[in-house]
Amino acid sequence: MHRRPSKQQVEREILSEKIKAVFHEHKGRYGAVRITKVLHNTGIMTNTKRVGKLMHLMGLYAKGSRYKYKHYNRKGASLSRPNLINQIFKATAPNKVWLGDMTYIPTKEGTLYLAVNIDVFSRKIVGWSMSSRMQDKLVRDCFLQACGKEHPQPGLIVHTDQGSQYTSSRYQSTLRQVGAQSSMSRKGNPYDNAMMESFYKTLKRELINDAHFETRAEATQEIFKYIETYYNTKRMHSGLDYKSPKDFEKYNS
C-alpha cells in the first residue's frame, strides 16, 4: 500500500514545475533571484533560498561566463571629447543620455561586428547595427536607427569610448546634425562605460557563448530576437527593481 504524498511534498512538486517552466521560458538565463521575482509577480510566494535549493536538486543552473571575451583592438583615435557623465549612469527621463560601444561576434563564416546604443534611463537598447566591417558607418547607422525610433531632443548626451569610429569626422558630424553632445571615456578605462560593458557581458553569457553561429546571417537573426523580443521587453534588470526596460519606461515616464 502506497502512502499518499504529504501536503508539503505536493507543494514542493508544484513549485518545482513552476520553477522549471520559468527557467526554460528564459532559456536558462535566469538564476534563483530572477526566477523568484517572476514567481512573485504571478502570485506565488516563496524565497530565493528555496528556489535555489530546488533548482540545484533539478540540476538547473543559469548560464555563466566560461571565458573572458575580448573586445577588438581599438586603434587610430584622433580626437577626444570631455567625459560628461563621469561614471554616473543615471538620467531623469528617456533620451537624455545614451551610451554606445562595439564588439565582435565570431561565426564560422567570419567576424560580425555589433554596435549598440543604450538609453541610461531604462537600459533599453534604442539602436543596434551589425556589419562584417568595422567602420564608422556601423556606429552611424546604429545612432541614426536610434534617432529614427526615439526622436531625441537637442541636448542628448551620447557617451562612447575613444575608438576611431566614434572620433571620426563623419560620426561627430552626425551627432551635431541632431543636436547631440559627444562624451567620451578616458583611454583604457572601461569603468567609464560600465553599463555598456555590462550589457555585452550579459549578451555573451546568455546568448553568444553557447551559440556557435554558422553564418553572419544566423548571428544577426538571433541577436535581433534577443534584443527586440527578450532583452528590451521581458528580461528583468536588478537596477530597474527587477523590471524589463519596457515596463520600467511604462511606469516611470
From Swiss-Prot:
It comes from the Bacteria. Residues 90-253 form the Integrase catalytic domain. GO terms for molecular function: DNA binding. The keyword DNA-binding applies. GO terms for biological process: DNA integration; DNA recombination; transposition. InterPro entries: HTH-like_dom, Integrase_cat-core, RNaseH-like_sf, RNaseH_sf, Transpos_IS3, Transposase_IS3/IS150/IS904. Transmembrane segments: none annotated. Keywords: DNA recombination, DNA-binding, Transposable element, Transposition. Belongs to the transposase IS3/IS150/IS904 family. NCBIfam families: transpos_IS3. Involved in the transposition of the insertion sequence. This is Transposase for insertion sequence element IS904. The gene is nisX1.
